[in-house]
Amino acid sequence: MQIILLDKVVNLGNLGQIVKVKDGYARNFLIPTGRARRATEAAKAEFEAKRAELEKTAATNLAQAQAQGEKLAGTAIKLTQKAGVDGRLFGSVTNHDIAEELNKQGFKLAKSRIRLPNGPIKMVGDNTVSVVLHTDVVVEVIVSVYGETA
């Protein structure tokens, strides 16, 4: 299926590109989330009429993400979990825990924006976590996990 991208999509293309994707990907994900439209002649003409407006919104979204990224860059989070003597946690620290702590500090982030490179954190210590604010803005945050013994 031929579609027109209304937003930048990772590994697919940028705003305004006409790309061919599998029908299910277009019907079930791209079109319902508002990232694409079917590439009919009418849709192409309508897109060209709204192109400047869409590019302006994309630019403002990127600027907002960059501004939030500058505030978030270098932020350190301290979390405490119950841990054994050897430093292993009873349970783990997940992206939900990190998002909750960042929200307490005033950053409005969904847990889906936080990427844990090695899965949930299961050891005491410092870990680097990626926060994806936009497809072009990725910020590193340091998460310090401290163990508390009961």
From Swiss-Prot:
GO terms for cellular component: ribonucleoprotein complex; ribosome. Pfam families: Ribosomal_L9_C, Ribosomal_L9_N. Keywords: Ribonucleoprotein, Ribosomal protein, RNA-binding, rRNA-binding. Disulfide bonds: none annotated. The keyword Chaperone does not apply. SUPFAM superfamilies: L9 N-domain-like (SSF55658), Ribosomal protein L9 C-domain (SSF55653). One of its GO terms (biological process) is translation. InterPro entries: Ribosomal_bL9 (IPR000244), Ribosomal_bL9/RNase_H1_N (IPR009027), Ribosomal_bL9_bac/chp (IPR020594), Ribosomal_bL9_C (IPR020069), Ribosomal_bL9_C_sf (IPR036791), Ribosomal_bL9_N (IPR020070), Ribosomal_bL9_N_sf (IPR036935). One of its GO terms (molecular function) is structural constituent of ribosome. It comes from the Bacteria. Binds to the 23S rRNA. Belongs to the bacterial ribosomal protein bL9 family. This is Large ribosomal subunit protein bL9. It comes from Verminephrobacter eiseniae (strain EF01-2).
